């Protein structure tokens, strides 16, 4: 009898646990319980095993023996029934969801339930939830988004990259969750969120905390984060990359627990921004499903400057001043490497610095040094300070203006229409084939406008001279084509002949000209002491070439010994027409050329024309007679003296005849209008003293063959 009463007592205790508050059905259940006790008593008397199942028709609940460690309950309740959470010592009622699926944003309607028993850590969990909610409400949210500013874009799919960054609480076990989202936006419509491959849960509430809990594990034990981890994550932003096939890993402070209580802050953030696709990682990490539209503006939170990008991803960063994200922003800026999607505005030309001069002491120190080296008397410099300013401008590139200088009329830019077709001279040849067309190239000279080589043309089976010049900028192209066009129009035995033009792979223009075996007038003057007959021969050849140029309204403007070629055959020709000017429709004024051969009117920055070539021609003859240019010790002194006093003359006048002196005096008149022309000089008696060509061939062969042997090491 005692055993029967003990079992009955246990039965009533179990029935109360299952049915809870259904007290209205107690009477019917007691009658059924008596019948059940009788069956068990009969079973005990017979010594058989207890039945497998006891069916409670009122509750329809399956039960097992009381000694079972876990009570697994499968319920099919009436609308008035409710579930009671079983104490933790017995079992756990778990709702396991696939972490790759998204929970519905609207929770299902739950049946009324009594408050569940408190878990050991429930009070701590509620405190964490309240603190996290207050932190999220009080702290600003830094939103970093990639968007296309063009609202009238005709594309139907415009990708928007967004980065959602929550500020890090300074005293809680929270970590910054950096979220990058991608959504498709239709024109003039709201963005449609993409599928989310993350486990999210709506914000917990007092009525449905236990029913809406989701977990990726099989236990409900809550793990607590350490204070050290929270402190470490306070000043840093941790970012993780989410694989399309794997659920995202939470930050360090949240990675130890994925239950509802430990992920309360994550659930709040996920539910608030559930319409975004979460992609944890740096701003520079690319995703197949997300791409920023070209030309996306970039605002740096440090200085709020705006830029845009065509190639790289850019982000729109709006950071409140209360959150310190300088390090993260700097890293994002480095990763983005944004470049403008439109060419930068052309830089305005830098205004030239003009130095006002009243006395010699007003010149800068570098100019003062050049003045001291020249050795020009101070009284002469003060008297001609304007000329000194012109000379120093040519030598240093600085601009000077006298205090009492009268205003000058602006310079006119003249563009000749006769020599603007040099591009037509280009021969259509692949740049890679140029080395095959011209073999055995060897450098023979180098100047300010390019480098000269001689080579063998495989096509023409002859030696040629090739002048290579940089051909990149617009100004270089204009000057190079201009020189080629002038040479193409010149057809004279005393002017070097043009063959063709090419452009190589390094953007250099090749001007292919006739090859002259020999050297320059400068080299010959240093190697040989010429007499008047030799000089008369050279003067006659040069004057014929100058006469041809001047009659065709062209001025060389850079005539000097280095631009005069002499061959072993006795030929004398003008080369290097890079500064040649068309004076048929213009009168140039600016200062160009070489300082020792420059005419006075050019140094004085006056309008000049063909007489400047006559002056330079005479200085070249003086160089040949003296075996050096006049006043070689100082370019400033040479230019200043020429502009004020004129040329100096012979080093040893006694060695030269009056005929030669008279010839040079006609060429070196200070006033260009009084200077003799090339046609007049060809009629001068000095020209009649010219040596024969055969004799000049022998002299030039001795000069240049000796130089060749010396250069070859023999």
Swiss-Prot record:
Alphabetized PROSITE patterns for the sequence: PROTEIN_KINASE_ATP, PROTEIN_KINASE_DOM, PROTEIN_KINASE_ST
Compositionally biased residues, Low complexity: 62-83, 95-111, 120-166, 178-241, 254-267, 300-314, 324-337
Expression across tissues: Expressed at equal levels in prestalk and prespore cells.
Keyword Chloroplast annotated: no
Chain residues that bind ATP: 444-452, 467
Region (Disordered): 1-267, 281-349
Basic and acidic residues: compositionally biased ranges: 23-35
GO cellular component: cytoplasm
Keywords carried by this UniProt record: ATP-binding, Kinase, Magnesium, Metal-binding, Nucleotide-binding, Serine/threonine-protein kinase, Transferase
UniProt keyword Transcription, yes or no: no
Example GO molecular function: ATP binding
Cofactor: Mg(2+)
Domain of life: Eukaryota
Catalysed reactions, as listed in the record: L-seryl-[protein] + ATP = O-phospho-L-seryl-[protein] + ADP + H(+); L-threonyl-[protein] + ATP = O-phospho-L-threonyl-[protein] + ADP + H(+)
Polar residues composition-biased segments: 84-94, 167-177, 282-294
Protein EC: 2.7.11.1
Residue ranges, compositional bias (Basic residues): 1-12
Protein's UniProt name: Probable serine/threonine-protein kinase mkcB
Organism: Dictyostelium discoideum (Social amoeba)
Taxonomic placement: Eukaryota, Amoebozoa, Evosea, Eumycetozoa, Dictyostelia
Gene: mkcB
